[in-house]
C-alpha cells in the first residue's frame, strides 16, 4: 500500500495544532515542580512560547492560504487550494497538478522541490 498524502495546508495546520498541545503539556509539566518556583516558571514560559509559536504558524498559513491557487477537484467537485506544483485535494486526497508536464505521472511530493535530483 502506498504512502498516504495530505494537503500541504492541512499538514501545516496540524503542525500548529500540535504546537498548542505541546505547550499545554509543557505547562502541565510545570505543575509537578510547584515546590520550585523558578523551574515551574521556566516550564510555564516555555509552554507559552510553544503556544505563541503556534499562533505565528496559524497566522502565516492564513496569509499564505489567501495567496494560493484555488482549483476545482475533478473527483469531488469541491474547491480546494493548491500549494506548489503538485498537491492533493483537501477533501478526497485526489492528486492535483497545474503543470502539464506532470499530468498522468505518479504523484510524488518531490516534484515541489526547486532542485531536482538527477539520476546518474
Curated annotation (Swiss-Prot):
* UniProt keyword terms in alphabetical order: Cell membrane, Membrane, Transmembrane, Transmembrane helix
* Record's subcellular location: Cell membrane
Q: Which residues cross the membrane?
A: 12-32, 42-62
State where it is primarily located.
Answer: membrane
Topology in the lipid bilayer is annotated as:
Multi-pass membrane protein
UniProt superkingdom: Bacteria
**One term under GO cellular component:** plasma membrane
Q: Which family does it belong to?
A: Belongs to the UPF0295 family.
Known HAMAP family for this protein?
UPF0295
Q: Please identify the protein, giving its name as recorded.
A: UPF0295 protein Aflv_0370
Give the species. Anoxybacillus flavithermus (strain DSM 21510 / WK1)
Amino acid at each position: 500500500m502506498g504512502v498516504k498524502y495530505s494537503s500541504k495546508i492541512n499538514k501545516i495546520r496540524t503542525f500548529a495544532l500540535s504546537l498548542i498541545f505541546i505547550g499545554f503539556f509543557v505547562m502541565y509539566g510545570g505543575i509537578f515542580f510547584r515546590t520550585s518556583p523558578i523551574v515551574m516558571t521556566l516550564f510555564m514560559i516555555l509552554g507559552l512560547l510553544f503556544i505563541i509559536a503556534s499562533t505565528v504558524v496559524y497566522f502565516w498559513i492564513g496569509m499564505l492560504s489567501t495567496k494560493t491557487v484555488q482549483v476545482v477537484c475533478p473527483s469531488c467537485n469541491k474547491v480546494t487550494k493548491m500549494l506548489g506544483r503538485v498537491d492533493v485535494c483537501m477533501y478526497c486526497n485526489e492528486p492535483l497538478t497545474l503543470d502539464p508536464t506532470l499530468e498522468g505521472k505518479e504523484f510524488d511530493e518531490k516534484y515541489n522541490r526547486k532542485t531536482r535530483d538527477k539520476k546518474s
